[in-house]
Design a protein with these regions (language model features):
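Membrane-proximal N-terminal amphipathic helix
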Residues: 28-60
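Periplasmic/extracellular, small/polar-rich flexible segments of pilin-like filament-forming proteins
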Residues: 55-145
Length: 145
């Protein structure tokens, strides 16, 4: 082979290598975004289950007299048997009670750049009473509206 052919071969290998690296990085970023979307979807589902639970009469499994959104736990909304946490293939979730509201925290269990943290605040039973925060500052407490 001549020098031009060798140069073209090396250049072609370098270009293919760069394309593979860029493709792997794009896949990793897309995977993180897809996981964050899944965590938000699960968190919104849990939030709407809490809202539905708070609207039920006590006779149908709703809150006892004097209870409110802040008294919700995973057992009361029918997700798992415990009250401390809930896990699925997307991540794990915890409920932090507040005064008439709750904060749901979702974590995919990974560390570093691949970690996703989702915070969902439920402050009432209306659709606009749900607030989400993805990979940002934590919602640590809430107050009912």
């Amino acid at each position: 082979m001549g020098q031009q052919q060798l140069l073209l071969l090396v250049l072609g290998i370098v270009i293919v290598g760069l394309a593979v690296v860029v493709g792997i990085q794009a896949f990793s970023e897309n995977q993180k975004k897809a996981n964050a979307d899944s965590l938000v979807n699960d968190g919104i589902r849990l939030a709407s289950d809490i809202q539905a639970w708070s609207l039920k009469p006590e006779a149908f499994g709703g809150p006892a007299a004097g209870d409110d959104l802040g008294d919700a736990d995973f057992g009361s909304i029918g997700v798992g048997t415990g009250t401390t946490g809930y896990s699925n293939t997307n991540g794990s979730f915890e409920i932090t009670p507040g005064t008439g509201c709750v904060v749901i925290t979702g974590d995919n269990g990974l560390t570093g750049d691949k970690q996703n943290l989702v915070y969902i605040s439920v402050r009432g039973t209306a659709q606009d009473n749900i607030e989400t925060q993805i990979n940002g500052s934590a919602i640590t407490s809430c107050t009912a509206e």
